[in-house]
Amino acid sequence: MNSSMASAGLGSRRKDPVYRGIRCRSGKWVSEIREPRKTTRIWLGTYPMAEMAAAAYDVAAMALKGREAVLNFPGSVGSYPVPESTSAADIRAAAAAAAAMKGCEEGEEEKKAKEKKSSSSKSRARECHVDNDVGSSSWCGTEFMDEEEVLNMPNLLANMAEGMMVAPPSWMGSRPSDDSPENSNDEDLWGY
């Protein structure tokens, strides 16, 4: 069995949708993109759905690579917000807005599918909206919070690595430990 057949077999067993620029971490979908001709990456956020993370990647790819970008949802290009500049903050803000819009679309599609299956169930629809401010974005009743940014994970890992390079503290003289024979006051605990 050659390697191309083996890789094709593995790919056909996957249940997760495969999109560019995203991966699943702890049950949530994260998105990031490498800046062209640089080694740095722009963190785009953590999302509850793969489609939302993929939409965030699409906006960043369009902003950084232009028409040459390979997109996850090429049919949605016209509806995506355009970042004000190519700065990481502007790209991140536009990516979050696109993810919020994609979350509303996915939520509405799921709702319509459920209504078709059970026409007797009456569920109250929530209105989806996206503001230009990333902090006030919301989608279908769920709230976005970038845990990586809140917990400062990239710096946390760097600080932990630096801590391993620090020399351990030296002991100030050698004090006898509490369980040494010199510190026992001639009492034998196990004397019968």
UniProtKB/Swiss-Prot annotation:
Binding region for DNA: 18-74
Disulfide bonds: none
Organism whose genome encodes this protein: Arabidopsis thaliana (Mouse-ear cress)
UniProt similarity note: Belongs to the AP2/ERF transcription factor family. ERF subfamily.
DNA-binding is among the record's keywords: yes
Keywords associated with the record: Activator, DNA-binding, Ethylene signaling pathway, Nucleus, Transcription, Transcription regulation
Gene Ontology BP, a term: glucosinolate metabolic process
UniProt protein name: Ethylene-responsive transcription factor ERF027
Pfam family, one: AP2
Domain of life: Eukaryota
PANTHER family, per the entry: AP2_ERF DOMAIN-CONTAINING PROTEIN, DEHYDRATION-RESPONSIVE ELEMENT-BINDING PROTEIN 1D
Signal peptide: none
Function field: Probably acts as a transcriptional activator. Binds to the GCC-box pathogenesis-related promoter element. May be involved in the regulation of gene expression by stress factors and by components of stress signal transduction pathways.
Bias type Acidic residues, positions: 179-192
Region (Disordered): 104-132, 167-192
InterPro entries, sorted: AP2/ERF_dom, AP2/ERF_dom_sf, DNA-bd_dom_sf, DRE1A-I
Gene Ontology terms for molecular function: DNA-binding transcription factor activity; transcription cis-regulatory region binding
Subcellular location field: Nucleus
Keyword Hydrolase: no
